[in-house]
Regions:
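Gram-negative outer-membrane beta-barrel transporters
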Residues: 336, 344-346, 350-352, 427, ...
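Periplasmic-side early beta-strands and strand-to-turn transitions of outer-membrane beta-barrels
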Residues: 141-142, 150, 166-261, 265-267, ...
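Extracytoplasmic beta-strand/coil segments of soluble accessory domains associated
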Residues: 34, 51-94, 110
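Membrane-embedded beta-barrel scaffold of Gram-negative outer-membrane proteins
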Residues: 283-308, 509-511, 536-631, 637-639, ...
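Short acidic/polar hinge/loop motifs at secondary-structure boundaries
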Residues: 92-116
């Protein structure tokens, strides 16, 4: 029979059985806060990619902004916009190491498991917030050919075809492909109102399962996806309050110079992201008499290009073109006890190696050379000239463009050993105790080669000395800047887990857990653009000192060098200190319960948590605006609660609701600045401020009403589905001066089913709610991406 779109309370883990190498029981029987979504759940909630999971899962927030490169996942007060993720992702038991690969098409996905809270003992690094496990359909349990076609407003189209074939009792396979086109939602006023975010994507997947014997299974997967999209539709919001305050502290005043562009997207260059993503893997499972052995091998190749108009304006200032080429190979060997034993245990070894090659040149255009290099230098000279007895200096830069280049190789090696044991029915019936420990080793290194175009500049120096004056100048001096070197560091982590659980009835339990989480450190390669600017300044000063007509002038050279050393001292550059960010750690405490009530017609999942995080990683733009960096923010504290309810009210009507509350604040985050006398001055105190990008509340309320039609009707069933998704308040900055208030979007779907076919009419953001999906600040200016507007669509599914 055709699978019905129904949200009645059925045990998804029994209907969609997934072989997992590590867990011994169903997720609702374990001491963990988890949400399981079937393919029917995903259709009802219009989940087409990982970014559509926001709100459906309590305390999960994944802002939909930028491009496929930017998959920022926040759970329970922690998350990441760039570099290492705080939430892990596994697809068919194979880890996706790089978050640049997290956003992919869900055309063939059968089930998604979302585990909240640290999963470090069994899954290791970068799962301190939780874990998302994605499972594709098994051709052994599902046969036939699925065809899906869809169209929607804003010129959106998609089509997919997948064939599932069971050749014999020993071999089955599935193969298929998809294509999707997005016409774009947002317009660029600087480029004749062209759509900023239009995109095309396509790909294919193959999965083959071979059973050589009754106790041996070999599961092979290969998939490839290519996408080419416009992106980064950021509206200008004006001069920031923080920028005004900082200028005021320095006795300066900044005023709005782009008032006509507030509320508009206005880039002169088209920003885009292009990605090719190949994944393959082999799962081997051997069932012995007393244990199950699994060996999982994975390989991923990612090749992408991001082009970003990084001044985010209609002016021709500067842009960045970042290219990544990553190859990752992973291997995991797991031994676990067979289900039903009093002693349930899991022992494993895991390792991966990633080769990552990145190029990220920043190109200053003619206006950028003028405003950000020449004018900045002359502004500093004017400030010096305002002091009594100071010289007058001026600079002219001749470069029509200036490239601040960078080539980086950042390989990562990781290995781990782990064990977890659960003792069931300990002392009394239903009481279980779990203890586990993981030893995790990681080595990261960076080989960098950052070369900048030499600055071609003229310099004038004038100083009045009584009746005499010094007038010196030189033309076409050259100032290069380069960084070439290698850094490496390694970490050893112990990730323990303790849990106690009491089960008094099947799928009725309470539990308490204590776990330690860990997120990897790394290197900020985009920081080299900032360092290069500093090095260019030092290099220009050196060129002036070495000039035969200025610094080497026979009469005044020594005096000028001494004066310049006092007025424009060289800045020391420590590459390691400037580019390295430390690992993030957390201790996580949780109590919860899984309840099955009302004769199985009501499910309730409850949890409360407390997280103590140290060296929390935060993403922000560098002060120059030339790139994003990760910094460590001291300590933070997060606590909250979650509740999920599902009820089958009648045979026709089912309801569901989920709510999450998170209170995440900094407890030790103070920024100081060294003074000339050796003392430190507090420049920012964020203690007590809310952690950015973490909604205080998430809410999802949904329902379904299924009508079984009479035999004389055209349709067999009509299914009405609706859900309301909400989140907020969300603070966007550490200062907590910009935020998005609590907001919600209403979505609905109507399915008309006849035999093995179904046509669906749907709407997203039906009330056309206007809200900010993302906000950031750079160079004292604010930018925002709006949430997508109201959209209507129709889908056709057919199986034969």
């Amino acid at each position: 029979d055709f699978p019905k779109d129904s949200l009645k309370i059925v045990d998804i883990e029994e209907v969609v059985v997934i072989a997992t190498p590590k867990e011994n029981r169903k997720l609702r029987d374990l001491p963990v806060a988890a949400t399981v979504l079937s393919q029917e759940n995903m259709r009802a909630n219009q989940v087409n990619s990982v970014k559509n999971l926001t709100g459906i899962v309590p305390n999960l927030f994944i802002p939909d902004y930028g491009s496929k490169l930017t998959t920022s996942i926040y759970i329970r007060g922690i998350g990441s916009r760039i570099n290492t993720p705080s939430v892990g992702l596994y697809v068919d038991n194979i880890p996706y190491i790089d978050k640049s690969a997290f956003d992919f098409n869900y055309a063939d996905i059968e089930r998604i498991d979302i585990l909240r809270g640290s999963q470090g003992t069994l899954y290791g690094r970068n799962t301190m917030g939780g874990l998302i496990k994605v499972h594709t359909k098994s051709p052994f349990t599902y046969q036939g050919t699925d065809i899906r076609m869809g169209a929607a407003t804003y010129n959106n189209y998609n089509v997919s075809l997948t064939h599932y074939h069971r050749i014999s009792d020993r071999f089955a396979f599935s193969t298929g492909g998809f294509y999707e086109h997005t016409g774009g939602f947002f317009e660029n006023s600087a480029r004749n109102n062209e759509k900023v975010d239009k995109s095309n994507a396509g790909g294919g997947r193959f999965r083959g399962i071979y059973l050589p014997t009754s106790n041996l299974k070999i599961d092979m997967t290969v998939n490839y996806e290519y996408s080419d999209q416009g992106g980064y539709p950021y509206y200008y919001t004006g001069i920031t309050q923080n920028g005004i305050a900082k200028a005021k502290e320095k006795g300066k005043e900044i005023t709005e110079d782009r008032a006509d562009y507030i509320g508009k997207i206005s880039y002169n260059d088209r920003s885009s992201y292009r990605r090719g993503l190949l994944n393959s893997g082999v799962n081997i499972e051997y069932q012995a008499c007393n244990f199950i052995l699994s060996a999982v091998t994975g390989y991923q190749n990612l090749n992408d290009r991001m082009f970003l108009d990084q001044d985010f304006t209609e002016r021709d200032i500067f842009n960045i073109e970042q290219k990544q080429r990553a190859n990752t190979i992973s291997e995991e060997i797991v031994l676990k006890a067979k289900p039903g034993k009093r002693w349930q245990w899991t022992t494993g070894a895991f390792g991966f190696y990633q080769w990552l090659h990145t190029t990220g040149p920043v190109l200053f255009k003619e206006e950028g050379v003028k405003t950000m290099i020449e004018n900045n230098a002359n502004s500093a000279f004017e400030e010096i000239a305002s002091k009594p007895g100071a010289p007058t200096m001026g600079m002219t830069v001749h470069n029509p463009t200036l490239s601040v280049g960078g080539t980086f190789d950042t390989p990562t090696l990781s290995g781990a050993l782990y064990h977890q044991s659960t003792f069931n029915n300990l002392f009394i019936e239903g009481l279980s105790v779990t203890a586990g420990l993981r030893l995790d080793y990681e080595k990261i290194s960076m080989k960098y080669n950052s070369l900048s175009t030499p600055v071609d500049f003229d310099f004038d120096f004038h100083l009045a000395m009584g009746p005499n004056s010094i007038n010196l100048s030189d033309q076409n001096m050259k100032a290069p800047a380069s960084f070439v070197g290698k850094l490496s560091t390694d970490y050893v982590q112990l990730l323990p887990k303790f849990a106690i659980q009491y089960e008094w009835k099947n799928q009725n339990n309470v539990y308490a857990t204590v776990t330690r989480g860990y997120r990897s450190g790394g290197y900020n390669i985009q920081m080299f653009s900032d360092l290069s600017q500093t090095e260019l300044t030092n290099s220009m000063m050196n060129a002036i000192k070495e000039s035969p007509t200025i610094g080497q002038d026979a009469t005044w050279g020594a005096t000028i060098i001494k004066m310049m050393d006092q007025m424009v001292p060289a800045k020391e550059i420590n590459v390691k200190t400037s580019t390295t960010y430390k690992p993030e750690y957390s201790w996580n405490y949780e109590v919860g319960s899984h309840l099955t009530l009302w004769e199985g017609r009501l499910w309730a999942d409850l949890a409360a948590f407390y997280m103590d995080t140290r060296d929390q990683q935060l993403s922000q733009f560098a002060e120059s605006g030339l790139g994003r960096i990760t910094i460590n923010a001291g300590k933070s504290r997060s606590y909250g609660a979650e509740a999920s309810l599902r009820a089958s009210v009648t045979k026709e009507l089912s309801l569901n609701a989920s709510y999450g509350y998170t209170y995440a604040t900094f407890t030790d985050y103070v920024i100081t600045e060294g003074q000339k006398d050796g003392s430190s001055k507090v420049t920012a105190d964020y203690n007590g401020k809310y952690v950015p990008f973490v909604p205080k509340h998430t809410l999802n309320i949904g329902g379904e009403y299924a009508i079984t039609c009479s035999p004389r009707s055209i349709f067999d069933r009509v299914v009405l589905q609706a859900n309301y998704n909400a989140a907020g308040r969300i603070y966007w900055t550490e200062q907590n001066d910009v935020s998005q208030s609590f907001y919600g979007t209403l979505n609905w779907r109507t399915n008309l089913e006849i035999g093995d076919a179904m046509i669906s009419f749907w709407a997203r953001n039906f009330l056309n709610k206007d809200y900010a999906a993302f906000y950031f600040e750079t160079m004292n200016k604010g930018f925002m991406q709006k949430g997508r507007p109201m959209q209507f669509g129709v889908d056709l599914r057919c199986r034969f």
